[in-house]
A protein has these predicted regions:
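Residue-level detector of anion-binding/catalytic polar loops
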Residues: 43-44, 92, 120, 146
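Catalytic cores of alpha/beta
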Residues: 27-37, 110
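Active-site-adjacent beta->alpha loops and helix N-cap segments on the catalytic face
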Residues: 1-10, 27, 52-61, 70-85, ...
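Active-site mouth loops of central-metabolism enzymes
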Residues: 16-30, 94-106
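Conserved, mostly hydrophobic/aromatic
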Residues: 18, 37, 48, 114
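Short beta-strand/loop segments at the ligand-binding rim of alpha/beta enzyme cores
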Residues: 11-17, 88-98, 139-147
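Conserved beta-strand positions in the central sheet of alpha/beta enzyme cores
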Residues: 17, 43-46, 123
Length: 147
């Protein structure tokens, strides 16, 4: 059972899930933000992958993504930063990102790196369900990634 299922099956009364955009406010602060959130009782963290056109997000997340990109955040850097995160953090980590940067990185490579870093799930708001079923589900399932 993955960490997300364990959390929701734990009979915990108060579950707190927090979103933040990787690379914001500083490029090198992502791991520290994750550590600090867990230390202060957050149950699950949604790590935003910055994108230049976050169409489904409000102005606050748009601005955070813009700042993160200005700071130099990319998927390559994010995966490098998180490669040892499971030595320090045990709560579920979920990526939220748009399809474009994931496709530029390569969907299978993205899934492989998620597994290497211990990412528990991925939210891709602009991935149509039918496209997921037809093209990406088999890859995600091969790596055990919950999309």
């Amino acid at each position: 059972m993955n960490r997300i299922n364990q959390l929701f099956n734990s009979n915990k009364k108060d579950i707190l899930s927090i979103y933040f955009c990787a690379g914001n406010p500083t490029l090198d602060g992502t791991v520290n933000v994750i550590r600090t959130l867990e230390k202060h009782g957050v149950s699950m963290i949604e790590v935003g992958i910055p994108f230049s056109d976050p169409m489904a997000d409000g102005i606050v997340i748009q601005n955070a993504a813009t700042q993160a990109l200005r700071n130099g955040m990319s998927l390559k850097i994010l995966f490098e930063q998180l490669r040892n995160i499971r030595q320090e953090v045990s709560i579920p980590l979920v990526f939220m990102g748009y399809l474009n940067p994931i496709m530029q990185f390569g969907f299978e490579n993205f899934c492989r790196k998620c597994v290497e870093c211990g990412i528990d799930g991925v939210i891709i708001p602009d991935l149509p369900f039918r496209d997921y079923q037809d093209h990406y589900r088999i890859i995600a399932e091969r790596y055990g990634i919950k999309v």
